[in-house]
Structure formats: structure tokens, C-alpha cells
Amino acid sequence: MTDTPQLLLAHHLKALKLPTFLREYDKLARQCAAEGLDHIRFLLRLAELELIDRERRMVERRIKEARFPAVKSLDSFDFAAIPSLNKTLVLELARSEYVTRRENIIAVGNSGTGKTHIGLGLGLAACQKGLSVGFNTAAALVHELLEARDEKRLLRLQLQLAGYKLLIIDELGYVPLSQTGAELLFEVFSQRYERGSTVVTSNLPFDEWTSVFGSERLTGALLDRLTHHVHILEMNGDSYRLNQSKRRSRRASADASVDNPTQA
């Protein structure tokens, strides 16, 4: 009978979805008793632990739902390697206030300059603010749209894409699109216009986007919507990935020289 209150409490806390309460209350009760704290302080600490853990789980869930190919933060981006990139603007955008204002971001630059890293970093920052985020490459997204159309579930996918607070479309311009694919992707942008924020990364300047969409009319209409409320990140320069590889190679050579001084 002495265990009945604990069993009932565990049952109620599970029903209320308070896992941190359940996990921590006994240990924290003993700790607060040792410190001479009253029941209000005890409950306050317990509630704070639950809130912190709930926020952590929420962020983890947002990150999982975003389907990032990798989790990267802006803290690990080497801004010095891409002098053309406005670091101040990027760090301001990391506050995710542009999402609330339904503004877009376009990162344009030659291949290997870290555009995907910037997109992932902005996406992670938005997840940490509790915002729903989706990530996909342009080619993969078009493939999903075509597949959904063939399987009679296009409307459901379009509603899902329109519902993200932030949608990140990576590598636009790397693969030319079919006419149907281009039209379906245009619909995604059109349905999100002034309803949600979209981040696009591309290796092509705007005047070459027609080569991707195949139609000047469609490209013009797309750019009109996408650039109405937009922050443009210029990211031209030497390959970010190549420079990172060179630095790693130099460090490895230096380490090898230290380990084997006779071979240096």
C-alpha cells in the first residue's frame, strides 16, 4: 500500500505528458529538502526543468520533420572564406524575424561557396525558434511533386508545402526541369507567396533562370513573386569546400611532419 501514491502519481504524470516531472521529482524533492526550500520553490524548479526539456524535444522534432541532409549551424560557417557574403545580414536573418514577416531569401553564387550550409544554418535557427521548416533540393522536390501527381495525392503535398513557416529549396539551377516539373515548382512558390517564407539557393544569376524553367513568362512570374520581399545573399568566390579540403590536407601534412620529423 505504501507504493500506491507513487504509482498513482506516475500514472497521472504520464497521462499529463510530463515526463521530466516524472523523471526528476523524487531527486529534486530530496535536493530541495536538503537546501531547506519550500514546496513553491520545489515546484518552480520542477516546472522549469519540464519547460527546458519540452523545448529541447520540440526543437528535435522540428529538425527531424525538416528532413535536413545534415544539421549545420551558422556558428560553424567560415565567413572569412566568402568575403562577398554579408555576415551582418546573415546573423540578423538567423533571428528568424524575416519568417514572421513572410520575407524570402535567395543565396546566389558559384558552386561550392557554402550556400547549402547557409540554408541549413538558417533552417536550424528557425527550428530553434519553434517554427516549422521543410528542406529539399529543387530536383528532389520536383520529383516528389511529379510522383504525387501520378499517385493522385498532389493536393495533399501542396498543402503540406504551403503550410511550412519556412521552406528551403536548395540547388535550384543545377538540373534543368521539364515543363511539367517547372510548372509544379512554380505552383509551390505561388501558393507560398506572402503566406510563408522561402529560402532558395542557386548557382545561377537571375538572368539565367530561364534555362531552368524553360519559359521566360514562367521565370518572370516566379521572380516577381520570389523577389517581392527578399534578402539577397551574394556568395561568389573560391570554392568553400575546396578551401576547407585544402586546409584539412595542410593540417594533416603538418601533423604527419610532427609525428615523423625525419621524413619532413
Residue ranges of predicted features:
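Charged, compositionally biased N-terminal leader segments and the immediate start
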Residues: M1-F21
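Interdomain "pre-motor" coupling segment immediately N-terminal to P-loop NTPase/helicase cores
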Residues: P19-A70
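N-terminal pre-Walker A segment at the start of P-loop NTPase domains
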Residues: K72-A94
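Conserved hydrophobic/aromatic pocket- or pore-lining residues that grip, position, or stack substrates
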Residues: F77, G119, T137
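Conserved post-Walker A coupling segment in P-loop NTPases
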Residues: R102-I106, L122-A125, K129-L145
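Walker A/P-loop nucleotide-binding motif
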Residues: R102-I118
